[in-house]
Amino acid sequence: MSGGNDGASWRLSRKPNAPNFDETQEDQWRSLREEVLQSDEDENIPESGDLTIPQLPSAKKAAKKLRKPPSGAKPTPKPKQQTLAQSMSDMDMERLLKRYRIDEDIDIAEDIDMSHLLQLHSDSDDGGDAQEATLTADEFLARLARAEAAPAASIAKEKRESGENVTVVALKDELFNVERDQSAKPPRPRPTPGAGGGAGYRNEETPKQAIELTATLAPQMDAAQFVSPAVPYKSGEMTEGLFYWFDAREQPHTLSVDPGSLFLFGKMAVEKNGRTSYLSCCVRVRNMYRSVFVLPKAGSSQEDVVKEINDICRNQGIEQRRIKFVERYYAFEVPGVPHEKTQWAKLRYPGRYPPLNAKGPFRHILIIMGASSSLLELFLIKRKLKGPSFLRISGLVASANRISHCALEFSVESPKNLRAEDTKLPVPPFTLASIQIHTQLDSKGACNEILIASVAIYKDVNIENTIRYIPDNILTGVRPASMSTPLPIDLESYCSAKGLPGVRRFANERALLDWLAQQLGKIDADMMIGHNFLGFTLDILLRRYQELSISSWSTIGRLDLKRLPRFQGTATNVNQEKETCIGRLVVDSYSLSREHYKTVNYRLLSLADQMQLQGITKGSNNFEPGTSVLTPAMLSASRDIYDVLLQVCNCAVLSTAVVSHLDVIRLTKRLTTIAGNLWSRTLFGARSERIEYLLLHTFHDLKFITPDRYVQNFKRGRDDEEEEDGKRKAKYQGGMVLDPKCGLYSDYILLLDFNSLYPSLIQEFNICFTTVDRESGSEIDVPPPENLICASCAAAGLSAPCLHKCVLPKVIKSLVDSRREVKRLMKIEKDANNLALLEIRQKALKLTANSMYGCLGFEYSRFHAQPLAELVTRQGRLALQSTVDLIPQLNPSLRVIYGDTDSVMIQTGIKNDIKAVRDLGLDLKAKINKRYQSLEIDIDGVFRAILLLKKKKYAALTVTDWQGEGKTYKKEVKGLDMVRRDWCPLSKCVCDSVLSRVLNAEGSEDILDYVMNYMRDVSEKVRAGRYTLDNFVISKSLTKEPEAYRGNSFPHATVALRMKQRKELVRVGDLIPYVICTGDRLSDKAFHVEEVRQNSQLQIDSEWYLSVQIYPPVMRLCEHIQGFSNAQLSEAMGIACHTGAKLEEEEAETMNDFSHSSLFQSRNLEECFPAALSLQVACTHCRLMTPINPHTRVMEVLADQERQRDRFDLYVCVSCRKSLPVDYVANCFTQTCYGIIRQFYQCGSAAAVKAVRTQFTYYRALFDVPHAPGCPARVKDAHYYQARRCLGVDRRLYTLAEAADPAVQEVADPVDPLNAAAETIYKRIDHLFINLDSLFAGI
């Protein structure tokens, strides 16, 4: 056969020279057809060439073998058999040829291989029956459709090898002409497998370079050579010092040692031999005081207030206290508190006493504020300490009883002994330690054990500069994986000779961890670096310390703690674990990269590849620290262990390299300096806390009483009360997103963007706690001019805005002005290091200003003020809408095609003149900005072409040099499938190629031709296995433990479970790579990449990838291109048109098909709702899970005549056959519904809407009247009179008939708990459903 042009189909006709069959040949074909009917095997199919078959017996000999019918029986008339040629129509032959046309390049004169239909029928020697059977053309083609590819060996060859004497006949008489029919399109070709063979992918192994060390490390073997020993100072030797602090901790009042004191950690300057050096130091600050503000009720005298305060203090055991009356301002969310200057009572008492109980009611006190403020917060605010800095400390007293691991330890009697140093001094050098451990599950698979620990040491690091990532030394400890396989004796000497000093081998894990704890104490690092240190490394270390009773475990921090945090099973208290690191700043490269670096894979080695970081090695092997499993055999030879240790050490170095690349140490330090919080908290990512401290410092300086830490609880209480009255308002509306004018635009698109929209709006309209009235009850609006000055300042004749008003706009203005000044300095700065510092400063200022609005809308922020947040977003919507309306007024030829929150896209209609586009943008900018004072719009970019698909989903060619010639372009993708990690690399590559052509094409015809040809080529290559395995890998993140996933629709969870069975480390948050192979269910088809590589029997499911991974994103990219249709694309790819097409759209369209006829077509609910989860509860007796299905229960009872006389219980355990309480089942059902709703709101897609609607429709039918139309009357009666049980307030069960009795209703008011629960759930989510009452009305 040969190929032809697209659009043609094939029509078959017999060649003129084909000879006719004689009678013997017809008999042979008849027998062959019987064989085809009886055989299900097609293994002996020749691949090509002449078909050879054994010579069949003649018709006469075959007839002799037939048994004679019994005497007296009339022979059954034998129907006339059709010949093969007669039984196959032209259409049948056409289908046959389509099925076996290999590709378009086969010559049309080739013979058709039909050997799979010709198999020898071997009759038994005793003369068995040889019944004749007819085979229609449809049956023939049905069997033909099940045939697979032919093997290379022929039947004749197999027969010869078996030793049988066979006669070979060449069937060259069945030849057909192939004529082209131009009216139809060709079928999809069936490509031959490529280099990948049967696996479905190309097996292309990248040669791996042997791993080797590239850095020179110091030869030290012990950390003691890196640190200064503790310096013992006698009392009186050092009374004043210069102290650089960077961390602090409050001593709880419940402890017996210095309760209510503070510990400051940092570096103390020490003079030695005329040189100043810095040693680690802990300063204990005693005699801290708490401050509480009390607002008297109107009409209460000061004496009454003082007396009541004294009574409260005496009741709580506060014996020492001071009370005085002061004037303060308040401007926040507690109702009833005056917002003008008011007289408050200030209570001060020692920090060793507990916080004051601020709960009322009180007789003369309206409210108590500040009781929840911590001593550490009061210290930072009152001493005006903003970030790490130098302190001049007087009255130092050397500590006799040391409680820290620092070289120096002092105490001071009062916080007033500390003051900020006025002279600007260089930051002291820091010591850094980067920690990397390798763990794997123990033999029982119960817990992680540590096999290798490596610490990279960095001495005398200037944190104001870029951090070097090559360490001064690396210390590494390793233990055997099995006690029966000790480590080689020459391991240390071998590693040292190879350039890796500092390696120590240990007999067991306890010796390894004891050594590690001691080394951390000797190193005395100021900063500890690690990848996922907080989420994994720290937790494992502390658990193993506890399990193995390591006495020096507290060297992980600088406080000599005696008690480890409490661990509850596998649960982790992250805050308690962080407390163990107090005094050492923790820099987690994983969490910081997630905050400051946008990618889809945050594994350390992946980040290093993306950032092009080298580390201290080159080359690679199959071992990845923290993921791979080490076997005793891998730790038996020094050479193999050396390779493993080198990888672990390299990961410790790469963590530092990632931190250095992101420059997060300098950035977080600058953010802390701006906000005035703790540096350690900024490193932990406490973004809202930074804004809280910035506002706390500001409002404290202005004599404002700030909100309590948990003021939102009070607010939520108000909301709960309003909800009961039905008056609770919905959450406020966010930014405006215009409906996009979807399509492909090839002219220039101008992008205008408001600079820092929300901070600018706060400045523009003076939106602040102090100016906006939230107490009047009316809708809040922009504050009028009279709200910009307080009464006291107005009485003093001061101008507006006064010092006590517009605090929030002033803070933002200060940040914006500072950033503008820094950017001005950046333009004239020449030194690279200074320029980097300025870049850090401006970035920190920008992040802080942009986060200011977030504290208003964040529910758990101390300064949460939803009315203000709503006012800001409302003004943002108005500003965007007015800009959209203004643009066509300024230039009627312009068209706004999209807008989102703070930006608009404008179609200019200009094709090739970038200067005209630039001038147009500058003109629009000037005219729009005339309308505002602080709000400013600017040109954010120019697009050469854009493909606009949906809201927040587009791809464009950005003109990077739009201010110049406009010849440089960069592709920008927002929100499309190709930027998500749950699409395989092949899908992303295909989409990228299609997108590049779409954005660069001249017309739609050119695009469609390319897309169809390209997708046809991709489909052929996928089926032929010409792509490598890495192209098919899908990665999904574990959001919970693999065991917690329910159902079979989570392939990554299935793969993760198998990884855990192989003792591989699997954690929540890990990306699980998997490949879909051939199989039935999706979860059964998913395999880890390494499983596929190691098992040649696993084959890539090419059809699944084409229809699920490639077709949908390409279809979405092209759906708005003129002339495109789904049928074109599916035909080019050779898949069914509906397969994978518009998955979300189709699900959304079918979502409303919840008619009674479409759902309830069976009496079995599981058949009506195959996708719904059945309801199962734990039996209260045997604790086994049992299904709940009342309708099935009734049907079972009615089917058994004997059981109808027994006591009937509707809910019975299927295992122990004991009855289940109705209210217990109702409670379990309610909890199940709430869990489904939680999962739905975490997803929220169209598919999730359909799923949750299906699930709750199933539940509604489960506990309602019989659901099937035509359900027997006796079943309905059983449901009504017996099965439908109602629970009364007297805890007695009633039937429906009894519940309908008015006398019973008056006494018991019975209700059906389960049906009531189903209806309650429906009311909560009725916006997702149709009217279900009408759905069940006709039953």
UniProtKB/Swiss-Prot annotation:
Polar residues bias spans: 79-89
Basic and acidic residues bias spans: 27-36
- Binding locations of Zn(2+) 2: 1233, 1243, 1271, 1286
**EC code(s) of this entry:** 2.7.7.7
Its subcellular locations are: Nucleus
- One matching Pfam family is DNA_pol_B
Its recorded reaction(s) are: DNA(n) + a 2'-deoxyribonucleoside 5'-triphosphate = DNA(n+1) + diphosphate
Which keywords fit this entry according to its UniProt record? DNA replication, DNA-binding, DNA-directed DNA polymerase, Metal-binding, Nucleotidyltransferase, Nucleus, Transferase, Zinc, Zinc-finger
UniProt keyword Phosphoprotein present? no
Q: What does this protein do?
A: Polymerase alpha in a complex with DNA primase is a replicative polymerase.
**Name by which UniProt lists this protein:** DNA polymerase alpha catalytic subunit
In which organism is this protein found?
Leishmania donovani
